């Protein structure tokens, strides 16, 4: 599959399209075929190096797609479900705590990829009246 990697943070010239293996979801993960992604200011800051990240990071925090595989322990999702990313995947409820406010695309690989394996709790269902392209624009701005 193809994915975009930030070979080294510090400039847009360091973004490259690369080949990668399709990931295998762990027992608590789902495999999503990414249909659409959207860009936001966070993604630019990561690429420019203003938000620290590792070399070869797959950027982008906002996307929508279809589940194509579910891990053995996942019960809340099924193949074919339309889902989108969430802005803070580790913050499930309650007052925000600093350690829970990491973004996909800076502390872990993001959605600039054809397929992503991600924790089942790190996604949400797309609105029924939005297509996948429209849904991909919601995670950050919809918060």
Regions found by a protein language model. Name each.
Residues 107-111, 130-143:
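A glycine-rich, Thr/Ser-enriched phosphate-binding loop motif common to dinucleotide/cofactor-binding enzymes
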Residues 42, 90-95:
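A short beta-to-alpha transition loop/helix N-cap that caps and shapes the active-site region
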Residues 95-109:
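Short, compositionally biased
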Residues 1-2:
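Extreme N-terminal starter segment of soluble prokaryotic enzymes
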Residues 10-15, 41-43:
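Short N-terminal binding/cap micro-motifs at the start of the first secondary-structure element
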Residues 21-37, 47-92, 107-110, 122, ...:
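Glycine-rich beta-strand-centered segment in the early N-terminal region that forms part
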Residues 115-123:
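A short glycine-rich beta-alpha junction/loop motif
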Residues 13-18, 63:
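Short beta-strand or tight-loop elements
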């Amino acid at each position: 599959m193809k994915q975009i990697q930030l070979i080294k943070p510090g400039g847009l010239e360091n973004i490259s399209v690369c080949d990668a293996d399709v990931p295998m979801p762990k027992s608590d993960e789902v495999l999503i075929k990414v249909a659409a992604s959207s860009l936001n200011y966070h993604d630019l800051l990561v690429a420019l190096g203003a938000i620290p990240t590792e070399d070869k990071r797959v950027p982008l925090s906002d996307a929508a797609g279809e589940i194509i595989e579910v891990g053995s322990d996942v019960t809340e999702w099924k193949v074919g479900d339309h889902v989108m990313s969430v802005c803070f995947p580790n913050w499930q409820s309650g007052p925000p705590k600093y350690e829970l406010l990491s973004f996909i695309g800076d502390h872990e690989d993001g959605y600039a990829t054809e397929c992503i394996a991600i924790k089942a709790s790190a996604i949400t269902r797309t609105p029924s009246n939005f297509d996948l392209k429209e849904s991909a624009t919601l995670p950050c701005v919809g918060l």
